[in-house]
Structure formats: structure tokens, C-alpha cells
Amino acid sequence: MRAAIYNPYLDTLGGGERYTVAVASALVNAGYKVDIEWKSKSIKKRLEERFGIDLSGVNFVRDIKRGDGYEVCFWVSDGSIPVLRARKNLLHFQVPFHDVGGRTLLNKMKLFRINKIICNSHFTKEIIDKEYGVNSVVIYPPVSVSKIKAKRKQNWILFVGRFSQLTQVKNQDVLIKAFKKFSKEFTDWELILAGGVEVGVGDYLEKLKKLAEGYPVRIIESPSFKEIVSLYGQSKVFWSAVGFGINAKKEPEKVEHFGISVVEAMAAGTVPIVYNAGGYKEIVADGETGYLWKKKRELVTKTINLIKTRGLLIEIAERTKAASRIYDEERFEQEFND
């Protein structure tokens, strides 16, 4: 049996790409010979290092011919509907595209060849279904929760996310500004910003470094999966400002579509305090498995309350670890292969 995979964003090494390699792994485990379309085979090592997934059973080829000759084709959409030719065609939306003319007659004709449309969250599904007139299914991304363990905790606040300024910005500058206020009282804490710098960074990284001058802020560029796991294990709190300042109804693509890094942090007992928008609301139960915030001052005040309230950090950390287990890889493979 042969399976084909296409993702035009592979070299960005983000959450959607983590989803893609998990699909490849699931197909290999199901007995398929898997081909991923990409212009260079060197991407394989980069994907393995970033996501900690063995891709030894996966081939990288220049053209999967839109699934022609394959039993299964998994295609990550860039907003368009492709003409796919495999026996079974799966179309995946990792971005909530809107106002792209999704209901044209041509798209409706192309959709006849699609067996299943998969979204990464209910947030994405709601927008995709409305835009294209379809009924997609939600399969949450897989998270390597069994590989992520709590270690001896340090006074670290962590954020993991790309530094790219393309499409969806991660707002690391907002986190630095909030940390400056936080550190006036908590001088022994450190903010760590870790993420990929491969695509679309421009001069943003230098601006962040200048903004952080004089404060205990550490920036880690393109860490490996092993490094990220270590950071999760030692950090006490996870911050995110993705979606801040964005009108989610007008620009849903700019808020967090799911939030794999939040689940990874939770697996390590690192308490998330994340912006109240998009997929984050499906992951974090406010006050139970972390906190959601809307105004910048809430990010700081909720963090201070978490730290100062005796026993609260440990209590919520235990709940986050339990909550993260529903996103494990075994669950993903079962749902994907159904």
C-alpha cells in the first residue's frame, strides 16, 4: 500500500508540520509506504530533530502527482481545493481560511473527489465549514506527552513559538513588555523565548533583543525537540500572547488555531497563562488547568496570583498533566485511522 503527503509549509517547522509528520508516522504504522512531496531530502533530518519523530519509513520525493497511483493522499490546503487522484483523498485545513471564495462551482466539483476534510480544532472547523459549505471532522493534533516529563522546576516563564512575522505573529514583544512589569517584584525569575527562525523573521529578532536589554530574558533560536522538552520540564509557567490585538472574527488566521506548545507545556506540569482566543479556549479551562487573559495587565496579575497563592501552582500543575493526556499520539492514530 502506498500513501502520499503534501504540505507546502514543511520548512516552517511549526505546529501544522508537526501534524503532517504525525500523519506520516501513523500511515507507516498502518503498513503504508509513505511519500512526502518536497524539493529537498535534507528536510527529513530537520523535521526529525525539531519534532522528535522517527521518519525512517518515509521517503521524500519531488512529485506525488496529486495522489495518482496511491491508495491514500493527505493534502494540507493553502486555502485552495486541489484536484486529488488517489483512491482515498484527505484534505487538511490547519488554517481557518475565510473570504477566499470557497463555495465556487469549481470548488464544489473538486470536493467530489475529497473523501474527508480534517481540521485541527473546532475553532478552525467552524470557519472552514462556513467558508466552503462542508462538514469537516476535527482530529486534534498529537502531542508526545509520554516523552515530556516534569523536572526540577526553575523560576522560568517559557514561550515556545516561531519568530516568523508571516501570517500569524506570536507577539513575543508583548511578553517581554509584560515580563518587565512582572520582574519589578519578582527579580529572580527569567523569561525564555524559544522558537524557529528559519522563515519570515526579518529584523524582528534584533528588535526583541534590544527590547529585552537589561532584563533576564533568554532567546533560544531553532531549538531541537530535546532542548524544548528540557525547557518544558524545568519551567513553572507558560505564557502566550498569540492573537492579542487581533479581531478574531475578521482575521481568524492570526489567532492560535490550536496550540500544540500549550499541551506540551501542560504535559510537563508547566501552568499555561494564554490569550483568550482561538484554539487555546479548547485546551485551557480557565482557573482549572491554567488561565486565560484578555487585557495585558491580566497576564501579569494572574501570574503573580498563581505564584503567591500557597499551593496553587502545584495544584494546577497536577491538573494540567492529567488534562494533557487526552492529546497523546495513540489517540491521534486511532482517530486518524478510523
What do the predicted segments below correspond to?
Residues 205-230:
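Nucleotide-activated donor-binding/catalytic signature segment of Leloir-type glycosyltransferases, i.e.
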Residues 294-298, 311-338:
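A charged, aromatic-enriched C-terminal amphipathic alpha-helix characteristic of glycosyltransferases
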Residues 38-42, 190-206, 221:
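Glycosyltransferase donor-sugar binding loop
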Residues 233-257, 270:
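Acidic donor-binding loop of glycosyltransferase active sites
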Residues 115-147:
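Donor nucleotide-sugar binding/catalytic pocket of nucleotide-sugar-dependent glycosyltransferases
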Residues 118, 149-170, 176-183, 191-192:
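Conserved donor-binding/catalytic core segment of Leloir-type glycosyltransferases
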Residues 262-267, 271-274, 284:
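Short hydrophobic beta-strand element within catalytic cores of glycosyltransferases
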Residues 286-297, 305-311:
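Conserved acidic donor-binding segment of nucleotide-sugar-dependent glycosyltransferases
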